[in-house]
Amino acid sequence: MEIKTRRDTSETSVRKDDEEEVEEEQPLSPAARVFHAPEFNCYVISVIGIKKKIDPDVIIEGLKQTLIRHPRFSSKMVSTSVGNKKRQTQSWVRTNVVVTDHVIVSDIQTQNIENGNADAFLETYVSNLTTVPLDISKPLWQLHLLDLKTSDAENVAVLKFHHSLGDGMSLMALVLACMRKTSNPDELPSLPNQNRSSSRSSRLMAGSRGDSRFLWLVMVIWSAIMLVLNTVCDALEFIATTMFLKDTETPIKGDFRFSKSKRMCLVHRTVSLDDIKLIKNTMKMTVNDVVLGVSQAGLSQYLDRRYGEKKKKVGEDQDSKRKATDMPKRIRLRSALLVNLRPNTGIQDLADMMAKGSTCRWGNWIGYIVFPFSIGLRDDPLQHLRRAKRIIDRKKNSLEAALTFVAGKFILKTFGVQVAAKIINRALSNTTMSFSNLIGPIEEISFYGHPITYMAPSVYGHPHALTMHFQSYMNQMTISLTVDPTVISDPHRLLDDWEKSLQSIKAAVQERDSRSLD
């Protein structure tokens, strides 16, 4: 695939009043240093569909007024030897930013698009980006603008950041702070209200207002006991996972022991958020519960087919009647489920920071939950939902995410970056996949005057052959898969299975409702 780029020759650097290139220096946080370790060199990529033809000059001018005013996006990473030169310190150093060095306007040759398949061309383009590291002599971000009409967008923008700039939640919030509502260009995007209080705490509050103080006290004590027990169990499982507890070697589990840097394939699919909300409201769950349950069903369908194809390939069961499933009866398949621990940093806070130079909390504030998927075919697809909800409800009544965050900081400070990176890498290598779910705007938004059709963020660089990201936007949900193509060569079939599972569960919910009305 041949891609030619052009750059604006005009001077677009952001100049400070001070003539010195280096304005200030700030040490990298321990988490940021881990993301630069060879075992854990992670990047965030977000593919953004645009409704109209992109005007690069407008985008560049908008970036000058917003994104590069953020300290991390106008700082480069500098390593300095200390003492005997065996130890190095890494710092963020403010620098002048030439925006056109970071904005790549791709001159796409239409004859290179095989069979006119622009979607496949986009996937190849993004996959190629995973093999090219960012230039550390400049701030660690890029924006690719593609004049490419795909099945779901008129043009496409691809944002690429190094994960050391911040966690996925803060980076996406920063991107959203650069955007405005299409209906009102002066207004920031609106996110759905999040009620962070759990059902457990709501019940406790209700009990405290009731007549039975004794019952309320019993509930409080029982809840505290379960919190401690769940946290201890989860902590022991995490320690065991770090040391020896491995997932089953399934067709979707990768091996990153010998190759730390691989070409990854990124694909996405957009489905109706209304379908997910219908299931959510009927089953009295959250959107995240539904997404986990559907993912469990989709993974079960995909693995069943992969195991069946494997048996056919080796010639097993050719003369006998095919069993109901070719999967092993007991499969341990766990996901590292990312949890945002950040006190709410709103889009407004980030917009004010870029406009006025104010400060707000920034960095990598994420914990992990080890979530076990119950893999298997079910006669009743709603069993996948109930099982996923039961597990995640127990995980919510645990301090596992906070504990992994605190333990990570302790290991970093006590043993250093290299040891911490190896421990995290080992823990993730013993699980199968990563999973995250981000809440997006509820109204159409524009990227410097360019209306957006979808956003598909993803991450690569960690030791998983499969990463699933979910991003809501307006009335749709975009599923992004990052896969190792040597392990999962058919990611679109996995997306097909996910979508079919969603429709199967939706049909089961509607059938149950119709029976209850009869």
From Swiss-Prot:
Keywords: Acyltransferase, Cell membrane, Endoplasmic reticulum, Glycoprotein, Golgi apparatus, Membrane, Stress response, Transferase, Transmembrane, Transmembrane helix. It is a single-pass membrane protein. The active site is at residue 163. Expressed in roots, stems, leaves, flowers and siliques. GO terms for cellular component: endoplasmic reticulum; endoplasmic reticulum membrane; Golgi apparatus; Golgi membrane; plasma membrane. Its EC number is 2.3.1.20, 2.3.1.75. Disulfide bonds: none annotated. Pathway: Glycerolipid metabolism; triacylglycerol biosynthesis; Lipid metabolism. It is found in: Cell membrane; Endoplasmic reticulum membrane; Golgi apparatus membrane. Residues 1-29, 185-205 are annotated as: Disordered. Induction: Induced in roots and leaves during drought and salt stresses, and upon abscisic acid (ABA) treatment. Up-regulated in the stem epidermis during active wax synthesis. It catalyses: an acyl-CoA + a 1,2-diacyl-sn-glycerol = a triacyl-sn-glycerol + CoA; a long chain fatty alcohol + a fatty acyl-CoA = a wax ester + CoA. The keyword Hydrolase does not apply. Its main location: membrane. One of its GO terms (biological process) is triglyceride biosynthetic process. The keyword Lipid biosynthesis does not apply. Residues 1-17 have a biased composition (Basic and acidic residues). Bifunctional wax ester synthase/diacylglycerol acyltransferase that uses acyl-CoAs with 16, 18 and 20 carbons as substrates, preferably in combination with 16:0ol alcohol. Involved in cuticular wax biosynthesis. PANTHER family: O-ACYLTRANSFERASE (WSD1-LIKE) FAMILY PROTEIN, WAX ESTER SYNTHASE_DIACYLGLYCEROL ACYLTRANSFERASE 6. This is Wax ester synthase/diacylglycerol acyltransferase 6. It comes from Arabidopsis thaliana (Mouse-ear cress).
